[in-house]
A protein has these predicted regions:
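Conserved beta-strand-loop surface patch within small alpha/beta domains used
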Residues: 1-68, 76-82
Length: 82
C-alpha cells in the first residue's frame, strides 16, 4: 500500500478539477530518492468523461523516471475528495 502525503493528494485533486468533466489519470513514480512523484498523464480515451486510458508515451516517460508504484484516475461524475 502507498500512503500519499498532502502535497501529492493536492496535486492529483488540482489535476482532476482542471481536467473535469473528463477523467484525469496519471502515475505515481518513485524517484531516485525513493520519494513518490505525481506524473500526470494524457487521457487518450475516446470517451474521456467515462473512461481513462494512459498514453503509451506518458507511460514510457514515467517509467524512465523511476519505478511506477501506482496508477490514479478521477471519477469525474462523482464528488471530488479532500
Amino acid at each position: 500500500m502507498i500512503l500519499l502525503n498532502k502535497k501529492t493528494k493536492t496535486r492529483i485533486k488540482e489535476q482532476s478539477i482542471r481536467e473535469a468533466p473528463s477523467e484525469c489519470c496519471g502515475l505515481i513514480v518513485k524517484n531516485e530518492r525513493n520519494k513518490p512523484v505525481v506524473f500526470p498523464c494524457e487521457n487518450v480515451s475516446k470517451e474521456k468523461e467515462d473512461n481513462y486510458r494512459i498514453s503509451p508515451e506518458d507511460y514510457l516517460a514515467a517509467s524512465e523516471l523511476g519505478d511506477i508504484e501506482a496508477v490514479y484516475h478521477s471519477h469525474s461524475k462523482e464528488y471530488h475528495w479532500d
